[in-house]
């Protein structure tokens, strides 16, 4: 059996609200956003900084319920500045024969990290969010 690493979900254009060098590594995300993006606490995520062009891998931790904070912790805090826009992506392993039917989930948030829209990722479909926002 062959497996492929595929995009599972992403939180698109989240705004970094805090960067904490002194906290152990991770990215803090509200439980509400984690749930709709199907990301578990301690799950590995890639973070792509739209503003600065940096990329890194870390793991998600649960923030406070109802919070809109996105906090990058530990050494990765050097790679972001509060106000930066980021994409937070999670991946999964899928059997090769199931890949054609796979549709990742995209979670869109507004400039305050409040849930705006959830939809499947579709190749060739452009975001309705203009850049720069």
Swiss-Prot record:
The keyword rRNA-binding does not apply. It comes from Legionella pneumophila (strain Paris). It holds the Pfam family Asp_decarbox. Substrate binds at residues 58, 74-76. The keyword Nucleus does not apply. Is synthesized initially as an inactive proenzyme, which is activated by self-cleavage at a specific serine bond to produce a beta-subunit with a hydroxyl group at its C-terminus and an alpha-subunit with a pyruvoyl group at its N-terminus. Its EC number is 4.1.1.11. It catalyses: L-aspartate + H(+) = beta-alanine + CO2. Catalyzes the pyruvoyl-dependent decarboxylation of aspartate to produce beta-alanine. Pathway: Cofactor biosynthesis; (R)-pantothenate biosynthesis; beta-alanine from L-aspartate: step 1/1. The gene is panD. Heterooctamer of four alpha and four beta subunits. This is Aspartate 1-decarboxylase.
């Amino acid at each position: 059996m062959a497996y492929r690493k595929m995009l599972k979900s992403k939180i698109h254009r989240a705004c970094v609200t805090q960067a904490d060098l002194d906290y152990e590594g991770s990215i803090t995300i509200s439980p509400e956003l984690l749930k709709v993006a199907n990301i578990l606490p301690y799950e590995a995520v890639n973070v792509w900084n739209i503003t600065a062009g940096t990329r890194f891998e870390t793991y998600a931790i649960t923030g406070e319920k109802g919070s809109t904070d996105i906090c990058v912790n530990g050494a990765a805090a050097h790679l972001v500045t509060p106000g930066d826009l980021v994409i937070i992506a999670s991946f999964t392993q899928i059997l090769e024969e199931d890949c054609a039917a796979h549709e990742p989930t995209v979670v869109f948030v507004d400039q305050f990290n409040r849930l705006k829209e959830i939809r499947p990722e579709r190749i060739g479909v452009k975001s309705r969010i203009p850049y720069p926002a």
